Each structure stands twice: as C-alpha cells, then as structure tokens.
C-alpha cells in the first residue's frame, strides 16, 4: 500500500511529515511519499499574517490537493489549523505532543532577564508580542516572518537582540542548542495546539482508520480543549489568544489568555479530563465575563 502525504515545503514541515511517515511505517508497514505544496502563507512573507486576512493560510492549498485526490492525507502543525474544519475533512489523529513552550534565542547568549532597556525582539506573533510587553514594557517588538532558519539569520541581519520561536520546531530541526532561555507556560502562554501535529484526512477516505493508531489520547484532548476555548472566542491569527491544557492524574488544567477591550486577560480552570471540551468553553466564558 502506498500513501501520499501532503505538506508544506519548509524544512520543518517536511521533518514533521517524516515523523508521521516513520510512525505509519512502524505501525502498518505502509510506504509513503510526500507531496510538497507552497501555501498562501508561505508565499507572502513581507506582510504579517494578521494583515493578510482569512483563516487557514497554511492549510487551504493542502486541502485542495486532497479534494483533487492528489494526496491521501496531510500533516499540519495544529497551531495552523482553524477551529472550524471544512465540510468533509477531519483531524483523524494527533500523535504525542512535543514541548509546548516558547524559546528565546539571543545574539550573544544574553539571557532574557539581562536584556538591555529597549532591546529589539523579533516576532510576528501578536500573542508573543503582547506577553513580551507584559514581561518587559520597554521592549521594541520587530515583526519578522520566514522559516526557522531564516528567522534565526535575521537576528544578525536586522540587528536584533533576540527572537522568540517555538521549542518544538527548534527540536525537530535540531536547532534547540541555540536556545538561550525557555519561557514558562504561565509567563508565555503557548499558541493553541503548539507542539502538536495533526493528521488531516477526508471523512470518506477508505483507509483513514489506519491513521487512528497514531493518536495519543491525552495529547488529543488537550489540543481539543484549547481549540474549544479558541472556538468560543472566535480566535484566529488576527487574535491575541493562547491556551495550554495539561493533564495530571486525570485532572486537566487549562491556562488561557485573550485580548479584550485592549486588555490582556489571563484565566485558569481545572476539572476532570473527560470534560475537556466543556472546560475549554468554560474558560472562554470566564474571560468574556471579565
């Protein structure tokens, strides 16, 4: 049996797809090949994502490939997947999640706490920018786009003091040795689904059940809880929004942030993990009442 897996062209996207292909090979001895696709989000690099407009900038072109039967499935970073799935598509599996934290990479290995006043920090994420300002209101936030390696190179090219990137992506492309600092998930709440990969298929695909074996239950329900939080707040790449769900002894804890009326609101909630979706919704409701 041969599967074609669609993914973005970036090195990180290809590495992430190789992770899924390796898991499939181990479980089912299935031969897979990658179909590389350049998405709208990949093509427009000079403009920040929130100004391009629309949802699913890194996903839609890949879904077209599945609709046209050029691919059997797709691998996404779950943080790129809109909470509303198009009709006929589903996330069939979410394997075990990687490190969810954000990392700081500086030019001369200077710790975040030791940055000079007015230091220039590169990020195009509204979520990261807002939380950086809460930690250090003096920081100068500089928008940067591009793949992981491109952003790292921009530290020198654009005379930045440092940049913020996801730990998971750095680990997957073996660049985590460059990390200067790790942000705690309470001081820098991650993006919805950060560190998690999702396998998307068409609901009618005859072999879709083969992917279900790759599902990691606790990782999946944590991501689904975060996505319920995002859905209730109608969040997307235009929003300053983040959430992180974790599980200990069947108890789920979720921390979430959202910008409302020009104010960053941060709330937490705890409950039994079988109520994961209700917890995400309840956390959003707490924020809306603030």
UniProtKB/Swiss-Prot annotation:
Gene3D superfamilies: Periplasmic binding protein-like II, Porphobilinogen deaminase, C-terminal domain
Lineage: Bacteria, Bacillati, Bacillota, Clostridia, Eubacteriales
Species this protein is from: Clostridium botulinum (strain 657 / Type Ba4)
Subunit structure: Monomer.
Family: Belongs to the HMBS family.
Reaction equation(s) it catalyzes: 4 porphobilinogen + H2O = hydroxymethylbilane + 4 NH4(+)
Residues where S-(dipyrrolylmethanemethyl)cysteine is found: 237
Pfam families: Porphobil_deam, Porphobil_deamC
Protein name: Porphobilinogen deaminase
Known EC number: 2.5.1.61
Listed PANTHER family: PORPHOBILINOGEN DEAMINASE
């Amino acid at each position: 049996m041969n599967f074609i897996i669609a993914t973005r062209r970036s090195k990180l996207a290809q590495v992430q797809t190789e992770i899924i292909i390796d898991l499939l090979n181990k479980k089912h001895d299935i031969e897979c090949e990658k179909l590389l696709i350049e998405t709208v989000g990949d093509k427009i690099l000079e403009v920040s994502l929130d100004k391009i407009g629309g949802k699913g900038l890194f996903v839609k072109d890949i879904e077209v490939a599945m609709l046209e039967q050029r691919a059997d499935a797709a691998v996404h970073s779950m943080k790129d997947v809109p909470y509303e799935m198009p009709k006929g598509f589903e996330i069939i599996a979410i394997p075990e999640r990687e490190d969810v934290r954000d990392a700081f990479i500086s030019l001369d290995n200077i710790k975040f706490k030791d940055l000079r006043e007015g230091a220039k920090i590169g990020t195009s994420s509204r979520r990261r920018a807002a939380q950086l300002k809460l930690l250090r209101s003096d920081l100068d936030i500089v928008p940067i786009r591009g793949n992981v390696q491109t952003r790292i190179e921009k530290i020198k090219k654009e005379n930045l003091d440092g940049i913020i990137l996801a730990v998971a992506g750095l680990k997957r492309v073996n660049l985590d040795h460059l990390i200067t600092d790790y942000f705690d998930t309470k001081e820098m709440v991650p993006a919805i689904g950060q560190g998690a990969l999702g396998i998307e298929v068409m609901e009618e695909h005859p072999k879709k059940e083969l992917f279900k074996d790759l599902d990691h239950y606790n990782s999946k329900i944590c991501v689904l809880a975060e996505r319920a939080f995002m859905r209730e707040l109608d969040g997307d790449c235009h929003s300053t929004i983040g959430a992180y769900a974790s599980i200990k002894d069947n108890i789920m804890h979720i921390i979430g942030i959202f910008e409302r009326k020009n104010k960053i609101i941060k709330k937490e909630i705890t409950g039994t993990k079988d109520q994961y979706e209700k917890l995400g919704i309840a956390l959003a409701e707490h924020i809306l009442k603030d």
